[in-house]
Amino acid sequence: MSEFIAFVAEKSGIKKPNLIEKDLIIHRILRDIYSSRHFAENYLFKGGSCLVKCYFGYYRFSVDLDLTWQAQEVWAGLGKYELRRCLLEEIGNFGSSLEKIAQDAGLEFKNELKSKKYFEFGGGSRMVTFKLWKDSELIKIQVNFVDEILFPDKTITVKTLLENVQLSRDDTAYFEEALEFYRPFKVKVYDEKEILCEKVRAILTRRTQKLRDFYDLFMLYKSGYKIEALKEQIIVKIKACLHYRRYRANLERNRKSLEFSAVTEDPFERELFVTKPPKDFDAFLERLPGALREIMNQV
């Protein structure tokens, strides 16, 4: 693996081996998830990882995966206990497949729903974080099983750091096994507008904001997707998550004080950046609190 990491670093021109390794791992996990027909048909790829690997290219690294169950209609009309039973059945199916995927990738994960080491539940099992481990390093796969999906999904190719790199025949032969899992493939994904709505929701319902979310919003803004144009949809998204107690508490906390200064200097978050944000990123950050407060005032 270390030799292939060095190869990707050389070919991509990005000298961040630890983050390259993380990209190889999450790419393999995602590919293996979507190699299952059931998962490929029923789960949508989303979030910052989706923006990087499907839409805008590697302006930053991602260190986790976010998915949503697409067929929300299957939960409609179910009572509280029947819904929980059905959710736990699907969570168990996903966890069982993930256990094999993790084993094949040399990661630690056990499909033990009662284990806090491997599972974190929210909202009566409506949202689950599956926690995979590479030694002491955590790789999170967060799945929203119940949520509002407002825009039609798309089918897009998941790219790698070797996109647009011409590989020689010798390179292809030498790294044949690694290139077999680190190659492009197609997935169903969230529309950019849906991702923007959830990015704003994440910022407003987290106890601590993350600089990567601001950079993602900036990239969406530069591509023509603006918070002001999607206020109604963002509010719908926020209201859909308010049955999570901690999100309600965080929203109230952020309503009283929305402070970005400490976030923008976080060295870990800065290390995720592949390219330094342009100067207008700072101007974007200065305008952002006003737009966010306007939304909070309407929730």
Predicted regions and their residues:
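Structured mid-to-C-terminal alpha-helical surface segments
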Residues: 1-43, 53-63, 69-299
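Glycine-rich beta-strand-to-loop/alpha-helix junction loops that act as flexible
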Residues: 45-49
